[in-house]
């Protein structure tokens, strides 16, 4: 089915208000969920909203909590999210990293006791729109087996790197081949994954999203490489925030809350003039996209450029929402 941005935001806002969230906070949170969905990231927008409300109802998310600064060390700050709403707090933390970068050339905010930030790419994009390089990542509950194991002991720990090119170039990737949100998107659409995304119950690689969702044997990106990246990202976020590791979040909490996150902004224009920056970025992009195609019908993609197209299409044609997901939201 198709809905407008306004219908989507109103549906989110209604549910949040019904849970006692104050009107200003509800409006800002609903706006972020709707913008994420409008950008084409359904897995962490409309599809994720019922799960967000479940955690709100369970008390994992504290809607009136405010993040608190703990430590300042020049360009580095440490904050405690105090289990506030994840996407609103993450936006605030990247804003703060940008402010620090304006003063120091680089800004880093380490956040502990945070909730799921929904679409991590929103915060990298936020920095790139203002002309900064944006880098951020989060740890999570253990939902992926380390390479060589059957049990989930590491997080998908998504990493975002956004570059202020025209259009914005951005990598937004979990350390698994697919996020669990993308497994759900493909399952709801009745599609197999385009490449192997995990193991079946017999230990064979599979493209069946429903099988992987059920047995939780999701495949690390690049096999042992994604496994290793997940581990070191967790270690850095834990140390810089003085927060909880994947092990602590998984073993000590009843659900995925109290995670640790990193937000970095770099002011490129302190190191290179704008015209030179743009020319260098354009040459990189042109060199890549003019390579001989393996398939004449498939353009060579640059990471994140599809979001500009998806946003324009959704604004023109309306936002596609799965019927079953919309029914869940209407029932909340």
Curated annotation (Swiss-Prot):
Keyword NAD among UniProt keywords: yes
Enzyme class: oxidoreductase
Active site: 44
InterPro entries membership: Diketo_gul_Rdtase (IPR023689), Mal/L-sulf/L-lact_DH-like_ah (IPR043144), Mal/L-sulf/L-lact_DH-like_NADP (IPR043143), Mal/L-sulfo/L-lacto_DH-like_sf (IPR036111), Malate/L-lactate_DH-like (IPR003767)
Taxonomic superkingdom: Bacteria
Annotated residues for binding of NAD(+): 168-174, 224-225, 304-306
Alphabetized Pfam families for the sequence: Ldh_2
GO annotation, cellular component aspect: cytoplasm
Reaction(s) this enzyme catalyzes, per UniProt: 3-dehydro-L-gulonate + NAD(+) = 2,3-dioxo-L-gulonate + NADH + H(+); 3-dehydro-L-gulonate + NADP(+) = 2,3-dioxo-L-gulonate + NADPH + H(+)
NAD keyword on record: yes
Entry's family note: Belongs to the LDH2/MDH2 oxidoreductase family. DlgD subfamily.
Known role: Catalyzes the reduction of 2,3-diketo-L-gulonate in the presence of NADH, to form 3-keto-L-gulonate.
Subunit structure: Homodimer.
Protein name (database record): 2,3-diketo-L-gulonate reductase
Organism (species): Escherichia coli O17:K52:H18 (strain UMN026 / ExPEC)
Gene: dlgD
